Amino acid sequence: MAKRIKNTTPKQDGFRMPGEFEKQKQIWMLWPWRNDNWRLGAKPAQKAFLEVAEAISEFEPVSLCVPPLQYENALARVSELGSHNIRIIEMTNDDAWIRDCGPTFLVNDKGDLRAVDWEFNAWGGLVDGLYFPWDQDALVARKVCEIEGVDSYKTKDFVLEGGSIHVDGEGTVLVTEMCLLHPSRNPHLTKEDIEDKLKDYLNCVKVLWVKDGIDPYETNGHIDDVACFIRPGEVACIYTDDKEHPFYQEAKAAYDFLSQQTDAKGRPLKVHKMCVTKEPCYLQEAATIDYVEGSIPREEGEMAIASYLNFLIVNGGIILPQYGDENDQLAKQQVQEMFPDRKVVGVRTEEIAYGGGNIHCITQQQPAT
């Protein structure tokens, strides 16, 4: 049985969160099923999730966690793919965002593996959370750790989602003020308190605070739509010259800020420009999404956060969102230039964006040890 580690922190024990670009053992995912979040009984979303899983499975194993009532359905759909690199695990969940409710894995210099189980409150709890209850999602990290036999730290009274952090594995973490300082997360903590928590549980020494994200309403501005480390000393950041684009102000501010920063090692950051979609992505057929009391309803024509930067780095590859947009090919070209030694695989993910996230949001990497 995996243990809960008490009275100490990852920093004290010599564990750190590795960069996403470091070697991985597998990718974890959850299965979408909520009729009040996904269109058409979640069937289009399930198809998109499977296409993401199939793309990942070309490079490394995928563990796909599925609630009991969807187990046979998911098993049949995966069998149709013919992939032997995707395993199905029965696990109850509230929704499918394992980046945010799953464990953040840690490693040490001896090759040992541990994890952080952050407090999860569905992106805002009773202030502006997206659904209630969220008790099953709050158990996902612990369940994954039990399956893998990984000891974990529980952050008592500290709420954090995995999509709100990006690390370089060498002491630097990217976050946004919009999310981490939002009153629905940790209103009892100061900015300095939050920095201390990040340093203790990620074993980082420098926190780079980007001001705003591009998703103020659902995630309250997660960093993984805006900027990420692609290797130590280098970040990708969304960018557009189109002043009429809805992401223009936030993208420009983030790019300008990061271009002036150094990392924990004192290196000036090299900032790569990542394009945004030519046209914003808007939700269609919202009437096929059920209304359920306790969940935030989706409305026809609301803007989905379609960010190319919400890609996933895997062993030897990049799994990149595509939207049928004019800039899809440009995004692939830019990412290939950032990662010349990795194969870039594009997957159409509008259906995931309609539900509130994208490829990075629905995946969680487990490092190799």
From Swiss-Prot:
The active site is at 361 (amidino-cysteine intermediate). Keywords: Hydrolase. It catalyses: agmatine + H2O = N-carbamoylputrescine + NH4(+). GO terms for biological process: putrescine biosynthetic process. The keyword RNA-binding does not apply. Gene3D superfamilies: L-arginine/glycine Amidinotransferase, Chain A. The keyword Hydrolase applies. Pfam families: PAD_porph. GO terms for molecular function: agmatine deiminase activity; protein-arginine deiminase activity. Its EC number is 3.5.3.12. HAMAP family: Agmatine_deimin. Belongs to the agmatine deiminase family. This is Putative agmatine deiminase. It comes from Streptococcus mutans serotype c (strain ATCC 700610 / UA159). The lineage of its organism: Bacteria, Bacillati, Bacillota, Bacilli, Lactobacillales.
